[in-house]
């Protein structure tokens, strides 16, 4: 009882001294605990995004002498794909990729380079992305995000049960898409878009919920899509599919200045951006050969068919411009200028 009385008295005195205000806990670092950030992702653990992110996380821990830890959560294990952007915007995740595959009206303007047939190669895509960096930075800042890097997934193709060789073959096909722009592409070319999170694509193909799925050919082996589809159709709908590494602004501001520098320097030390683009090219080249070894058939539509698809797809551009307004129009002008058009 005496112990309880003394404890009560001590708390009362403390409250009187502080004017009745609650005493704030000591900062995390003052308590001797490392700063922990969570980084969710959709890619499989063996995919190059996760390999490179793990290298970055290891470098942060090394350079901070254990004062900071970034935990990488692969394969949608922390949040499903559609939740990645909301999670980093509202601070549930301190750092996360903003995938062009899952842009919504929150950041739809970022997807200008993902418009159908805007680019046809990784090199073109990167050239334009570099020129658009200030635009991307500005758009993210409006949502309280700090842009750290611009990197990419390889070009987007179509996995399917039956070959899609001609524009006519698109008609009525139920195809998995991953956002507004990809849905517009499929709809414009005559297909029926079905939004399916990345982690559910295998099951959708296996159960034939869809006739095919739009994604990178590099997913054939790590996601085992070769088990549930027979063809990869090389329409080169986009030269790449951008991904931006973003930090929640409040989380960044709460980080001590020296740890901010550690994060920035670690990305440079592991050559994160360059490595991502290099790996995208390497994996794309390797995927085509490997998919054939796994029993898949590569379908290369005639140039005339791709030209027809490119012409028709301009309707999707107009739909995107209506949704993105003045910022979208400015982004498109910047992209076309960067590509010399």
Q: Which sequence ranges carry the predicted segments?
A:
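N-terminal secretory/targeting leader peptides
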Residues: 29-124, 132-341
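Short, low-complexity disordered leader/linker segments with a strong preference
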Residues: 1-36, 341
């Amino acid at each position: 009882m005496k112990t309880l009385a003394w404890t009560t008295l001590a708390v009362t005195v403390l409250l009187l001294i502080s004017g009745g205000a609650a005493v704030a806990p000591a900062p995390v670092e003052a308590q001797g605990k490392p700063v922990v950030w969570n980084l969710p992702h959709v890619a499989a653990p063996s995919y190059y995004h996760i390999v490179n992110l793990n290298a970055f996380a290891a470098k942060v821990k090394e350079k901070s002498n254990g004062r900071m830890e970034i935990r990488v959560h692969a394969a949608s294990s922390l949040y499903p794909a559609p939740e990645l952007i909301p999670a980093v915007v509202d601070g549930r995740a301190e750092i996360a990729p903003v995938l062009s595959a899952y842009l919504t009206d929150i950041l739809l303007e970022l997807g200008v380079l993902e418009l159908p047939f805007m680019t046809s190669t990784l090199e073109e895509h990167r050239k334009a992305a570099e020129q658009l960096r200030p635009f991307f930075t500005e758009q993210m800042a409006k949502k309280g995000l700090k842009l750290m890097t611009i990197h990419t997934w390889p070009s987007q193709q179509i996995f399917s049960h039956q070959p899609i060789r001609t524009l006519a073959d698109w008609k009525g096909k139920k195809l998995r898409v991953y956002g507004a722009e990809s849905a517009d592409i499929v709809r414009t070319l005559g297909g029926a878009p079905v939004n399916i999170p990345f982690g559910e694509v295998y099951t959708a193909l296996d159960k034939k919920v869809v006739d095919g799925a739009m994604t990178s050919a590099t997913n054939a082996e790590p996601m085992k899509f070769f088990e549930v589809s027979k063809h990869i159709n090389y329409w080169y709908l986009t030269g790449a599919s951008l991904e931006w590494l973003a930090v929640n602004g409040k989380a960044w501001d709460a980080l001590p200045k020296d740890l901010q520098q550690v994060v920035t320097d670690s990305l440079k030390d592991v050559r994160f951006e360059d490595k991502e683009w290099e790996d995208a090219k390497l994996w794309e080249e390797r995927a085509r050969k490997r998919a054939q070894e796994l029993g898949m058939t590569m379908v290369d539509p005639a140039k005339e068919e791709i030209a027809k698809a490119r012409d028709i797809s301009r309707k999707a551009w107009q739909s995107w411009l209506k949704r993105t307004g003045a910022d979208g129009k400015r982004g498109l002008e910047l992209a076309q200028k960067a590509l010399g058009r």
